[in-house]
Swiss-Prot record:
It comes from Mus musculus. Residues 419-458 are annotated as: Disordered. Residues 446-458 have a biased composition (Basic residues). One of its GO terms (cellular component) is motile cilium. This is Dynein regulatory complex protein 10. Pfam families: IQ. Belongs to the DRC10 family. Residues 397-426 form the IQ domain. It is found in: Cytoplasm, Cytoskeleton, Flagellum axoneme. It comes from the Eukaryota. Residues 428-445 have a biased composition (Basic and acidic residues). Its main location: cytoplasm. Component of the nexin-dynein regulatory complex (N-DRC). Interacts with CFAP52.
């Protein structure tokens, strides 16, 4: 434990001064408006106090991380420091040096004890006791080192000029110290945003995050389904490709075999084709003469048909011209009607835009009225609760008063009855035993209840 407390890395690193921004601002994000607080400044005193305490802690840690430079280079700063500061710094350095030396001694002894585990038990116990004593002394030195660190820090805070000089002369901070400061600054920004956020915005943010998580889960499910489907499709495609490759290989083999046997068949077919060509040439000569005669006959028939169809063509052209003129008239009429409709549509669109603006204003008024209604409703609920509580308190007070009155009346009645019984007893005693005097103790006992009865009657 003591070794863990003493092993402190150097608090400065690098040659450039690392300035730490202690102010955070809200970054505007258009697509994430629900996650941005509506306020930009702290309004409550408690929040301002919290932020001031955190800023002061960050400033102190910033100075503490630069103290290692002051510890390693005390001669560079002695000329600019007062005497009490130099004295406190030297005491701090002496305590730190002794602490490091004792920690190294304790570490060496601990290693030696681990190496000599096979020695006698008594010697091991003695060494363990000595190690425990060294650890206790080391803890006291660690407490002294902590107190001296606080003293030096208090003196540094009391000298703002020395603080600025230390920040200028110190080369930088170690990665661990810089990481600690960055974490504190990040914590400050998070706390600042947390204090700016109202409970309503927290609920909206939680709802927004839940919606995004649900949407992400649904998208992930869809992605998983699509990936499974894609895997199945790829498997099917691979199987189909394998089948097609197998078929292609078989076709190649078959084609190779066909190519081997095709040469002989090609020669035979060539000879047969030459013979067939001669026969077909003769037959074609006969068919050619016959077709020429048919062509002459068809030409004469075609000429006759053309002459017959010219009259029908002229009639159809007249009909087509008439239909085209009617179509043009209809198109002009359609254009006029569409122009009127377009003007009417533009008028309606302008009216629609005006009504839409009015609707937006009404929605804003409705939102304001809803907020006012919720506030009034909350206030009425609080007032009704207070009124019910007051009525209950009044009922309890009335019951208590009636109970107290009943108890008091019963007590008065009992005291009156008791006094009457005593008077009756006195009358009977006087009649029976005249001349006999009671003892002094009995007389005193009788006088006491009489006095009590008189006080109650009053």
């Amino acid at each position: 434990m003591a070794l863990d407390q003493v092993s402190i890395p150097p608090s400065y690193h690098g040659l450039a001064i690392q300035r730490i921004p202690l102010r955070t601002g809200l970054v505007p994000a258009e697509p994430m408006k629900t996650l941005v607080p509506s306020k930009s400044k702290l309004n409550t005193i408690e929040a301002k106090r919290i932020m001031s305490v955190l800023d002061e802690a960050i400033h102190k840690i910033e100075l503490i991380t630069l103290m290692s430079y002051m510890e390693s280079h005390p001669e560079a700063l002695e000329d600019t420091l007062p005497e009490d500061f130099v004295r406190a710094l030297r005491e701090h350095l002496d305590i730190g040096q002794t602490l490091v030396e004792r920690a190294s001694i304790l570490q060496r002894r601990h290693k030696k004890l681990e190496e000599e585990e096979e020695a006698e038990e008594t010697r091991n116990q003695e060494r363990l006791l000595s190690l425990e004593l060294h650890k206790v002394n080391l803890l006291t030195l660690a407490h002294q080192f902590r107190d001296s660190t606080k003293t030096v820090l208090r003196l540094v805070l009391g000298e703002p000029q020395f603080t600025r000089l230390l920040q200028v002369q110190a080369p930088g901070r170690s990665p661990g110290a810089q990481c600690l400061l960055d974490g504190l600054v990040e914590l400050r920004g998070f706390l600042f945003e947390k204090l700016l956020t109202s409970p309503m915005e927290v609920r909206e943010k939680n709802q927004f995050i839940q919606d995004i998580s649900r949407r992400s889960e649904r998208n992930q499910e869809v992605i998983d389904d699509l990936q499974a489907e894609l895997a199945n499709v790829l498997k099917n495609k691979e199987s189909e490709v394998e089948k097609e490759n197998f078929v292609i290989q078989e076709l190649k083999n078959h084609l190779h075999q066909v190519f081997k046997f095709s040469e002989n068949s090609l020669l035979r077919t060539k000879q047969e084709a030459e013979k067939q060509q001669k026969v077909d040439f003769r037959a074609s000569q006969v068919r050619l003469a016959k077709t020429q005669q048919d062509i002459l006959a068809l030409r004469a028939q075609y000429h006759n048909l053309v002459m017959e169809n010219r009259e029908a063509e002229q009639a159809l052209r007249k009909k087509k011209y008439k239909v085209e003129t009617e179509i043009e008239n209809w198109i002009q009429k359609y254009d006029m009607e569409m122009g009127e409709k377009q003007d009417e549509y533009e008028d309606l669109e302008s009216i629609h835009k005006e009504e839409k603006l009015q609707l937006e204003e009404l929605r804003e008024r409705h939102a304001v009225l809803v907020e006012e209604f919720s506030q009034i409703r909350a206030e009425s609920e609080i007032n009704s609760k207070k009124r019910v509580e007051a009525e209950r308190e009044m009922v309890r007070m009335v019951r208590a008063a009636t109970l107290i009155q009943a108890v008091w009346k019963g007590y008065l009645v009992r005291s009156i009855l008791r006094s009457k019984k005593k008077k009756r007893g006195k009358g009977k005693g006087k009649d029976k035993g005249k001349g006999k005097e009671k003892p002094k103790e009995e007389k005193a006992k009788e006088k006491k209840p009489k006095a009590k009865g008189k006080g109650k009657k009053k």
